[in-house]
Amino acid sequence: MRRIDPNKLELEERVVAVNRVAKVVKGGRRLRFSALVVVGDKNGHVGFGTGKAQEVPEAIRKAIEDAKKNLIEVPIVGTTIPHEVIGHFGAGEIILKPASEGTGVIAGGPARAVLELAGISDILSKSIGSNTPINMVRATFDGLKQLKRAEDVARLRGKTVEELLG
């Protein structure tokens, strides 16, 4: 899969979660902050990243840099996705279903951020299992990576789109 250059895109950032984490040492606890950020151009490109630092803004900055390195391209048909898909990560699972125009983004928390920044405006989703933000974001990404356009599938099978769709 080819790398997407983040400098050519107008990316919007959204902080999904900021967590205070502690390392217990002999003298007490060392506190740091971890941040989960989703970036996207609302036109079929989206990425997520995590960052950890002693200060919240620094953690967010690191997460944004990380997110720009993990961009993926999402096939969008009109305002929705081409077909139904199930994304998995750990104990988290998310079902993504295409929806008719005007439905809106029906998704909870972290998944909503990913789908909106990907540029999908009509979709139904259901999160099952783990509801930790990082697991939900990764499961959503897994689902989005599985999506294929009808033209791509037809080319792989050596058929026309009409033959494929009947």
Curated annotation (Swiss-Prot):
UniProt KW rRNA-binding keyword: yes
Family annotation (Gene3D superfamilies): 3.30.160.20, 3.30.230.10
Domain S5 DRBM: 11-74
Keyword rRNA-binding included in the entry's annotation: yes
SUPFAM superfamilies: dsRNA-binding domain-like (SSF54768), Ribosomal protein S5 domain 2-like (SSF54211)
Keywords: Ribonucleoprotein, Ribosomal protein, RNA-binding, rRNA-binding
GO molecular function, one term: rRNA binding
Pfam family, one: Ribosomal_S5
Gene Ontology BP term (one): translation
Entry superkingdom: Bacteria
GO cellular component terms, semicolon-separated: small ribosomal subunit
Role of this protein: With S4 and S12 plays an important role in translational accuracy.
The family this protein is said to belong to: Belongs to the universal ribosomal protein uS5 family.
Quaternary structure (record): Part of the 30S ribosomal subunit. Contacts proteins S4 and S8.
PANTHER family, per database record: MITOCHONDRIAL RIBOSOMAL PROTEIN S5
Domain comment, as recorded: The N-terminal domain interacts with the head of the 30S subunit; the C-terminal domain interacts with the body and contacts protein S4. The interaction surface between S4 and S5 is involved in control of translational fidelity.
Name of the featured protein: Small ribosomal subunit protein uS5
Biological source species: Geobacillus kaustophilus (strain HTA426)
